[in-house]
From Swiss-Prot:
ATP binds at K12, L13, S14, G15, G55, R59, T162, Y168, D171. This is Uridylate kinase. The keyword Secreted does not apply. It comes from Xanthomonas campestris pv. campestris (strain ATCC 33913 / DSM 3586 / NCPPB 528 / LMG 568 / P 25). Pathway: Pyrimidine metabolism; CTP biosynthesis via de novo pathway; UDP from UMP (UMPK route): step 1/1. The gene is pyrH. It comes from the Bacteria.
Length: 240
């Protein structure tokens, strides 16, 4: 097998990715499969960090639209990401990995505070780092949190796993003639309003020259193939 094209990555998983065929919570079979994928990538020599959303448990923005205070809702959403991070930590540790959960909000009896230098040290020591609670601030999505953490740890690549196999010009579930892009610039994504991540996350990654690959993770071994240079999904990088 060829050498790795990327040595340090951050993988962003949605909370919904943990549900499987359910409509809420965590499917043990799904999280176990995802854990195997992550460990396979790490055993190949990559330093792996994770950010997991919380939408399978709670979505603050949705309840804010129904009248809940937005800041309160977002704080509840941050706690949901901590729950998912702990679940993934457990799944990874059962497979023999060394894992650290680091939170943007203080929950010291449950996990570590996020400290950039410590996070990098964990990765250098062969531990998988899971970053929870987004940026620690309301009004920012976990996509923005993933972009921020990827920049802070000096990741070579930000990966976002989605339900589809890349970025399309329109919703492929609704339009049979939808066309998938192999590559895009950040400016093209923002100008065309392609809603695969929020604009703040795209702008952060663009301004830091961080490449982003958006792909589907339903196929076993796909993460490892990307690390070895396979052109899977859509690569977003650079400016127009």
């Amino acid at each position: 097998m060829s050498e790795l094209s990327y040595r340090r990555i951050l993988l962003k998983l949605s909370g919904e990715a943990l549900m499987g065929d359910g409509d809420y919570g965590i499917d043990p079979k799904v999280i176990n499969r995802l854990a195997h994928e992550v460990i396979e990538a790490q055993q190949a020599g990559a330093q792996v960090a994770l950010v997991i959303g919380g939408g399978n448990i709670f979505r603050g923005a949705g309840l804010a639209a129904s009248g809940m205070d937005r800041v309160t809702g977002d704080h509840m959403g941050m706690l949901a990401t901590v729950i998912n991070a702990l679940a993934m930590q457990d799944a990874l540790e059962k497979l023999g990995a060394k894992v650290r959960v680091m939170s943007a909000i203080k929950i010291n009896d449950v996990c570590e505070d996020f400290i950039r230098r410590r996070a990098i040290r964990h990765l250098e020591k062969g531990r998988i780092a899971i970053f929870a609670a987004g940026t620690g601030n309301p009004f920012f999505t976990t996509d923005s949190g993933a972009a921020l953490r990827a920049i802070e740890i000096g990741a070579d690549l930000l990966l976002k796993a989605t339900k589809v196999d890349g970025v399309y010009d329109k919703d492929p579930k609704k339009h049979s003639d939808a066309v998938r892009y192999d590559s895009l610039t950040y400016d093209e994504v923002i100008m065309q309003g392609l809603e695969v991540m929020d604009t703040a996350a795209f702008a952060l990654a663009r301004d830091s020259d961080l490449p982003l690959r958006i792909f589907g993770m339903s196929e076993p071994g796909v993460l490892l193939r990307i690390l070895h240079g396979a052109q899977i999904g859509t690569l977003v990088q650079g400016r127009s």
